[in-house]
C-alpha cells in the first residue's frame, strides 16, 4: 500500500505495508520518497525519483517509481488533477483517502476516514493525535489528567477537536454550549409499575380525600411499598430518589394507625426538618381530628426573630414528629410507657447511620425501639444507600428499591481559570436558569453550594449587584430570616440561594439547578454520599421538566494532595459508598448505658447478645466494667439497672469524660475546706462547651490582609488569626478605630498568664462569658451580636449565639440532673435559676 500526497511541486510517496487493517493504524513508512512530474509528449510522467532513508538521499530512475506504483495498492490524499491524470495514463488503479497530518510531522502515517477522524483546523486528524492535543492543552492549562476522560468523551460525541478545546477559550459561554460541558445525563427510564388508584387502597375515606388533592394515583415507589406489605405492618426500607414520594409512604401506613389509636411517629435528624414536617402534618391531619405533637428537645429561649419549639406532651398525641434524640431521650428516661400503643415509626434519612456522631445513636435507637415495642412497624427512608439489602437485613426490613429519578438529571463540568471566572460563570447559569420556564409554569431556580458562610454572602452580594435575586442561607441566620428566604424562594421571588454544604441535609428548596462552587464540607472534601445527596436536590417533578447540576472546579486550586479539578472528576465518576455504623469507644459506652437505662437489656448476657455481631473498638465486658466502675450502672441478683447518675448522663447524651468533670466539679468532697469555693454551673458549661462561631469582621480581615499581604483566615480562634491579633506590631498597621477594637480585644480577652498564650482556650472562654453576661442582663442575641461587632470587630451571627445559648441550657440541664442524682440541691436549684434567666 502506497500513499501519494501532493506537497507543493513534489509528490510524496509513503509505502506503509499491507492495506489490510491500515485504517486508524499508525505506521512507520518503509521509506520516504518523492517524485517530480513533468508533461512529456502531452502526458504527465515522473522525471525524477528520490528515496530518503535516514539522512541519506538516493536518486533512482523514474521508471522505478512507476514499477512500485503498479505493484502496490495506491491511495491518493485528497484530489489532485495532475497526479490523477498520470495514474490514469499509466493504467494504475487508485483510491482516495485521508491521512492524519499531525502524524506525518512525527514521521508516521495513519489512514483515517470521515467517521474515524476528528476535525482540527479544517483538517482530519487521528484519534491518537487528537487525544495528545487534549493532554497537551490540559497540561498547559494546569489541569490534571483525571479530566482527560471527560474531554475524550466530548471528542467522541462531537468529532470536533476545535470545538472541544474551545472550552478553554476565555470567551467560552457555558450557557450557549451546554453540550460541551455535559458530563452525563441520568434519564428517567421506562416505568413498568402498574398505577394504583388511591380509591382502591384499604385506608379510611377521609384520608383518601386528603391524598387525592394531589392526584388520583400513587407514585410508582408508593405502589411498590403497598405491594410489599405497607398496610400489613411490614417493616420496610424505602430507597428512592429525592422527590419520588417516600414521605407519603410513611403517612399511608402511619395515619390509619393513628386514627385507630396507635401512635404514628415521624423522626428526622434535624430540628428544621422536624419543624417543617410538624407544620405540614398539623395542616393536613388536624382536620381528621388527630393531635400532632413535636419532640425536638429545644429550650424556650425568648429572642427576636427566633422560633422556640417547646416539646409537647406526647402522651395524648396521635402523631409525634421529632428528632432522633427527641425520641431517644424518652426511651433513655425509661418513659417508653408514655407512648401507649405505638403503631408506625418512620426513620427519615436513615443513611445517617453512616454519620460518625449520629450513626451509633440512630442504630441504638432503632434497636431499642424494636426491643421495647415488639409489634411496631418501622419504615426507613433514604435516597442514597449503596448496600440497601445489608441495611434491610440488619433491621429485619423488606427492601423496596426504586432506581428511577422522577425527572432527568444533567450533570455538567466546567473548569474555571480563576475565582472571578467561576463567579461570572455562576452568574450566567443562574440568570439563564431563571429565564427557563417549565411546562408546569415555574421559573428555574438555583442552589449554589459553597464551603463557608462568608462566601455565601459574598457570592449572593455579587449576584445581587448583577440583578439576580439571590440570598445567602446558613445556620447562623435567625429563624425569621431563614423562614422569609424559604417563603420567597417557594414563591419564586428569589431565583438563587447560596448556602453551605454543611446545611445541605436541612435545605429543602425546590430547585431545578444545583451549582457546586466548592467541593468541600468546611475544610474536608465532600464524600461520595454527601455529593449524591446534594445533587439529588436538582429537579422536582411537581415543578420542573429536568434537573441540572454544575461542578465548577478552579484550575490549579489545591487542598492537600488533590486539586479541585481532580476531586470534581472523582465525584462525578463515583458511586455512593456503602453505609456502615462506625463506633468509637465513647459510642460503645454510651449505647451500653442507654440500653440499660431504657430497659432494652436486663442482664449482662442480654447486653453481650445485643452486640455479638458488631465489630467494636471496645469489648462489651470491658465497656460494662467502665460504666459500672464509674457508678453509672449497678447489678443486683444478676439484674442490671442504671443508677440515678447513670440515668442523668444517658438522657443528657453526654460522654463519660464530660460527666465525670461535672461530677467532680460539683462534689464538695473534692475540695478542701480552705479551697472550697462556690460552684458556678455557668463556668462548668463554658469549660465544656465554649462559643465557637466567632469571626473577624470583614473590615478588620480586609485591612489586616492588605497590611500584611496575606490571605488571612476569618475564623477568630484559628491559630494563625490568634498569632496575628496578639501581636503588638499588628496595631501599628491599622487605622485608629480598628486599633481601638483590637486593643479592647487584647486587653479583655488575651491578657492571661498562660505559657501557651495566645493559643490557650482563654480567649474563647472569656468571649463565652461575655456573651452569657450580656444574656443575663436580658440582652437579645441580635443586640449581643451588634455589641461584639462595634466594640471588638468580632462578627458572630445572632443565630449562632441563639443556638449556643440553647446548647448552654442543655449543658445546665445535664449539670442539674447530675446534681440531683447526688442530692446536691443547691447546685440543681442554681442551674434552674440560670436556665430561667437565659430563657427569658
Write out the residue ranges for each language-model feature.
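Conserved segment of the helicase C-terminal RecA-like domain
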Residues: 376, 509, 520-569
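SF2 helicase catalytic motif II
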Residues: 320, 324-328, 334-373, 378
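Walker A/P-loop NTP-binding motif
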Residues: 227-234, 245-262, 280-282, 367-368
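Conserved Walker A/P-loop ATP-binding site and its immediately adjacent core
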Residues: 247-248, 262-283, 328-329, 383-389, ...
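Conserved interdomain linker/interface between the two RecA-like ATPase lobes of SF2 helicase motors
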Residues: 367, 375-460, 554-556
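Conserved helicase ATPase core of P-loop NTP-dependent helicases/translocases
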Residues: 302-310, 458, 469-472, 477-500
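Helicase-associated low-complexity/disordered flanking segments
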Residues: 1-223, 227, 233-236, 290, ...
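C-terminal helical accessory/scaffold domains
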Residues: 613-616, 621-623, 629-630, 634-840
Amino acid at each position: 500500500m502506497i500513499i501519494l500526497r501532493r506537497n507543493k511541486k513534489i509528490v510524496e510517496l509513503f509505502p506503509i505495508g499491507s492495506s489490510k487493517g491500515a485504517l486508524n493504524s499508525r505506521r512507520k513508512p518503509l521509506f520516504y520518497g518523492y517524485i517530480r512530474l513533468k508533461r512529456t509528449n502531452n502526458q504527465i510522467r515522473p522525471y525524477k525519483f528520490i528515496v530518503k532513508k535516514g539522512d541519506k538521499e538516493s536518486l533512482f530512475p523514474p521508471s522505478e517509481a512507476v514499477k512500485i506504483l503498479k505493484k502496490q495498492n495506491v491511495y491518493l490524499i485528497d484530489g489532485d488533477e495532475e497526479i490523477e491524470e498520470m495514474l490514469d495514463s499509466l493504467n494504475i488503479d487508485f483510491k482516495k483517502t485521508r491521512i492524519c497530518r499531525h502524524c506525518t510531522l512525527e514521521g508516521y502515517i495513519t489512514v483515517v476516514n470521515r467517521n474515524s477522524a476528528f476535525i482540527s483546523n479544517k483538517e482530519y486528524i487521528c484519534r491518537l493525535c487528537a487525544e495528545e492535543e487534549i493532554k497537551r492543552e490540559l497540561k498547559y492549562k494546569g489541569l490534571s489528567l483525571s479530566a482527560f476522560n471527560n474531554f475524550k468523551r466530548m471528542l467522541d460525541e462531537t468529532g470536533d477537536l476545535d470545538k472541544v478545546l474551545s472550552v478553554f477559550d476565555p470567551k467560552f459561554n457555558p450557557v450557549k454550549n451546554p453540550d460541551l460541558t455535559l458530563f452525563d445525563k441520568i434519564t428517567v427510564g421506562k416505568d413498568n409499575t402498574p398505577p394504583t388508584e388511591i380509591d382502591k387502597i384499604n385506608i379510611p375515606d377521609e384520608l383518601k380525600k386528603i391524598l387525592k388533592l394531589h392526584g388520583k394515583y400513587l407514585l410508582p415507589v408508593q405502589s411498590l411499598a403497598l405491594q410489599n406489605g405497607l398496610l400489613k405492618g411490614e417493616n420496610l426500607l424505602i430507597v428512592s430518589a429525592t422527590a419520588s414520594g417516600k414521605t407519603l409512604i410513611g403517612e399511608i401506613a402511619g395515619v390509619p394507625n393513628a386514627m385507630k389509636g396507635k401512635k404514628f411517629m415521624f423522626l428526622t435528624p434535624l430540628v428544621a426538618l422536624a419543624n417543617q414536617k410538624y407544620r405540614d402534618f398539623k395542616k393536613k391531619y388536624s382536620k381528621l381530628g388527630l393531635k400532632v405533637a413535636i419532640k425536638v428537645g429545644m429550650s424556650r429561649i425568648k429572642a427576636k426573630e427566633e422560633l422556640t419549639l417547646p416539646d409537647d406532651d406526647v402522651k395524648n398525641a396521635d402523631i409525634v414528629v421529632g428528632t432522633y434524640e427527641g425520641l431517644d431521650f424518652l426511651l433513655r428516661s425509661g418513659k417508653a410507657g408514655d407512648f401507649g400503643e405505638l403503631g408506625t415509626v418512620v426513620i427519615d434519612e436513615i443513611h445517617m447511620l453512616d454519620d460518625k456522631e449520629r450513626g451509633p445513636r440512630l442504630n441504638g435507637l432503632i434497636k431499642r425501639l424494636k426491643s421495647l415495642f415488639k409489634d411496631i412497624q418501622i419504615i426507613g427512608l433514604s435516597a442514597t444507600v449503596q448496600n440497601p439489602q445489608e441495611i434491610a437485613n440488619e433491621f429485619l426490613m423488606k427492601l423496596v428499591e426504586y432506581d428511577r429519578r422522577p425527572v432527568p438529571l444533567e450533570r455538567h463540568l466546567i473548569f474555571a481559570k480563576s475565582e472571578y471566572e467561576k463567579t461570572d460563570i455562576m452568574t450566567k447559569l443562574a440568570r439563564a436558569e431563571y429565564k427557563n420556564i417549565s411546562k408546569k409554569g415555574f421559573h428555574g431556580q438555583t442552589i449554589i453550594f459553597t464551603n463557608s458562610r462568608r462566601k455565601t454572602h459574598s457570592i449572593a452580594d455579587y449576584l445581587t449587584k448583577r440583578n439576580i435575586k439571590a440570598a445567602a442561607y446558613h445556620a447562623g441566620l435567625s429563624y425569621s430570616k431563614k423562614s422569609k428566604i424559604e417563603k420567597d424562594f417557594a414563591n419564586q421571588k428569589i431565583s438563587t440561594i447560596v448556602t453551605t454544604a454543611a446545611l445541605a441535609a436541612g435545605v429543602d428548596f425546590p430547585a431545578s439547578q444545583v451549582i457546586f462552587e466548592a467541593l468541600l464540607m468546611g475544610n474536608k472534601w465532600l464524600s461520595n454520599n454527601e455529593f449524591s445527596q446534594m445533587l439529588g436536590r436538582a429537579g422536582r417533578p411537581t415543578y420542573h421538566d429536568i434537573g441540572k447540576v454544575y461542578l465548577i472546579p478552579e484550575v490549579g486550586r489545591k487542598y492537600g494532595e488533590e486539586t479541585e479539578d481532580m476531586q470534581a472528576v472523582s465525584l462525578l465518576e463515583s458511586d455512593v459508598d456503602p453505609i456502615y455504623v462506625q463506633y468509637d469507644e465513647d459510642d460503645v459506652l454510651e449505647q451500653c448505658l442507654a440500653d440499660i437505662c431504657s430497659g432494652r437489656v436486663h442482664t449482662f448476657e442480654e447486653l453481650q447478645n445485643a452486640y455479638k455481631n458488631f465489630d467494636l473498638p471496645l469489648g462489651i465486658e470491658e465497656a460494662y466494667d467502665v460504666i459500672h466502675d464509674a457508678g453509672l450502672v449497678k447489678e443486683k441478683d444478676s439484674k442490671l439497672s442504671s443508677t440515678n447518675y447513670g440515668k442523668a448522663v444517658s438522657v443528657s447524651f453526654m460522654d463519660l469524660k464530660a460527666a465525670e468533670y461535672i461530677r467532680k466539679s460539683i462534689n464538695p468532697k473534692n475540695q478542701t475546706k480552705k479551697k472550697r469555693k462556690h460552684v458556678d454551673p455557668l463556668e462548668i458549661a463554658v469549660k465544656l462547651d465554649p462559643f465557637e462561631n466567632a469571626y473577624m469582621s470583614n473590615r478588620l480581615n480586609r485591612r489586616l490582609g492588605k497590611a500584611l499581604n496575606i490571605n488571612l483566615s476569618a475564623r477568630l480562634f484559628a491559630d494563625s488569626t490568634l498569632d496575628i491579633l496578639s501581636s503588638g506590631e499588628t496595631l501599628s498597621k491599622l487605622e485608629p478605630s480598628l486599633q481601638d477594637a483590637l486593643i479592647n480585644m487584647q486587653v479583655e480577652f488575651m491578657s492571661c498568664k498562660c505559657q501557651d498564650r495566645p493559643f490557650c482556650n482563654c480567649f474563647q472562654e472569656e468571649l463565652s462569658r461575655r456573651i452569657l453576661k450580656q444574656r443575663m442582663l436580658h440582652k437579645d442575641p441580635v443586640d449581643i451580636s451588634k455589641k461584639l461587632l462595634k466594640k471588638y470587630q468580632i462578627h458572630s451571627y445572632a443565630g449562632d449565639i441563639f443556638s449556643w445559648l440553647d446548647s448552654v441550657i442543655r449543658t445546665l440541664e445535664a449539670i442539674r440532673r447530675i446534681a440531683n442524682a447526688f442530692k446536691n440541691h443547691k447546685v440543681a436549684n442554681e442551674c434552674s435559676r440560670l436556665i430561667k434567666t437565659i430563657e427569658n
